[in-house]
Amino acid sequence: MNEAAPAFPDASVSDCMAVAELLGRAPKTAFTVVVRSADGTPVVTRNAPLERDGTPMPTRYWLLPSSRASQAIGRIESMGGVRAVELVVDPTDLARAHSAYAADRDAAMPAGWTGPRATGGVGGTRLGTKCLHAHYAYFLAGGDDPVGRWVFAQLALHERDIPVRGVESHASVS
């Protein structure tokens, strides 16, 4: 029998307001902020595996769109970053990251849930790389993601501000 809403720790009221402002809409799923900027602004959310209406949510870790990292990653993607990373990342390591991501999302499913479930790994992808933002969010949240590591290295090479795990720090690169 399906439960109506997932059991998942909701964010604080202030986090809900901040995330809604960053998204430009109300969040569709319960979430917890797992990475913040140095000033406390939410950067990455860990999302419940189901939206509030029971629709599967494949994206467990979400890099919020207004972060400096998100904008820089958009530039990397527009310059062919997805193709570039697929040429250098070991497919076995990437498959492991997809499996670990899916296992993390599946472990958060409500007990007894028999309705639809999200499939795939990072961002719902089964193979390869779909979205550098999703891989980077997972990496920042502590996931062992080779694509997220690659994105981190690209940001370190090309951006003055380097987002790091746990806190989006703004360290200068010489």
Where are these regions (language model features)?
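C-terminal charged interaction modules
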Residues: A107-S174
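An exposed acidic His-Trp-rich patch
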Residues: R68-A118
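Polar/charged alpha-helical tracts
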Residues: S14-E21, T92, A103, A107, ...
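Conserved aromatic-histidine-acidic binding/catalytic patches
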Residues: R25, D53-M57, P116-G124
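Short N-terminal edge-element motif at the start of the domain
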Residues: M1-N47, D53
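Intrinsic low-complexity, intrinsically disordered or marginally ordered coil/linker segments
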Residues: M1-V13, A72-I73, M79-E86, T119, ...
